Structure formats: structure tokens, C-alpha cells
Swiss-Prot record:
This protein's encoding gene: rps11
Assembly with partners or alone: Part of the 30S ribosomal subunit.
One function term, GO molecular function aspect: structural constituent of ribosome
Keyword annotations of the record: Chloroplast, Plastid, Ribonucleoprotein, Ribosomal protein, RNA-binding, rRNA-binding
One term under GO cellular component: ribonucleoprotein complex
Protein name: Small ribosomal subunit protein uS11c
Taxon lineage: Eukaryota, Cryptophyceae, Pyrenomonadales, Geminigeraceae, Guillardia
HAMAP family: Ribosomal_uS11
GO BP terms in the entry: translation
Organism: Guillardia theta
Subcellular location: Plastid, Chloroplast
Amino acid sequence: MVRQVKKSSLKKNKKVAANGVVHIQSTFNNTIVTLSTLEGDTVAWASSGAIGFKGAKKGTPFAAQIAAEKATKEAISQGMKKAEVLINGPGSGRETAIRALQAAGLEITLIRDITPVPHNGCRPPKKLRV
């Protein structure tokens, strides 16, 4: 169904603290999930595009779910147990990514939406016709 993209990089399996932060950047076109320590050092990350989805499929909730599962499994293998979740963006993969984090075994302590909302700033782009 989805072709896996192989990466040839050396990864250090360093143990990290049990607490961390999950950043979910969800746009209309892609979803990026980054797990980091409380200090901000990246532990694991995954995106819909890096998983192997292409084009419009990157923006789907299913692609966000797979990306969240992959990043969470990698972080749990390095010792992370609990995490705060910071969600940014208007995309369709927001809730699905959170459910995937919980299903993968990560205990969520806090969910915070940090999507920037203008106080009537710049004119937005034209309405999307779906």
C-alpha cells in the first residue's frame, strides 16, 4: 500500500528522560510529529511524507496516525514514558495523531493547542472549495 522509504543514517540509541514533549504540526498538506525532551532536544520525529505517503495522501488522518505511531515507538524504545502534547495547525490529522500516541503506549499528561490565531491581521487566502 505505502512504500517504505529507507534511510541510511546512524542513530544513537541513547536513553532519555521519562518525560518529554510531543509537537504535532498539522497542515492541510502534511503532518509532522516530533518528540523531544523537556529541554527541547529532539528524540524522534516522523512525518507523513517521510513515511512514504505522496501528494494529497500526506494530509489524511491515516497518514498522521502512521507517522505518530512510528515516532512514538522510537521514543518509547529510548525510554520515554510520559509526554505533553503541543498541537499546531489546522490540519485533519490532529486528533488522529493524539489517539495514535495513546494507542502506542505513551501516557499523555497535557494537551495544549498552540495554533496562532490573528487578531484580524493579514487577509486570509481564498476559501477552499471541496
